[in-house]
Amino acid sequence: MCIRDRNEGPQVLINEDRLFIIYSCGQSWLPTYKLAQLKLKNPDNNLLDRDNWIKSGPVFTGNEEVYGVGHAGFTTSPDGTEHWIVYHTKVDRKPGWERHICLQRFIFDFDGSPYFGKAQPVTVRQPLPSVSGINKRNN
C-alpha cells in the first residue's frame, strides 16, 4: 500500500488497447519506495472518472539486493521487439537520494498487464536491446 499523498512520477504505458499509468509511491528517500499501477478498465471510458480505473500495486519493488525502486520510464528496443523499463534505485538502505540508474527488459502478461519481474542489482549485466532487422554499421 502506498502512503497517502506520496504518489509521484506518473508514466503512461500502452499495450495494444490497454492503458496503464505506472507511478512511484512511498517515500523516495527510503528503501521501501516502489512502483504501483493504474489500469483503465475500458479504452472507451472517460479517463477523468476515477471509477474507470483499477488501482493495483506494488507492481515493482526492491528486494534484498535492490532498494527504493522508482521513477520509471519505458522504451522499446531499436527493432521494436522488446520492452524496457528505465528506473532508479537507492545506492544503499540508508535514507537519502543517492541513486543508480537501471535498465531491464519486461514483458506483458497473459492479460496484457506489464510484468516487470524482479529488480536486478546494478552488478548484473543486462543483455543488449535487440537490433535484429536493423542495418548495423561496421566500424
Question: Which functions belong to the PLM regions below?
Answer:
Residues 4-139:
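Carbohydrate-active catalytic/glycan-binding domains of CAZyme proteins
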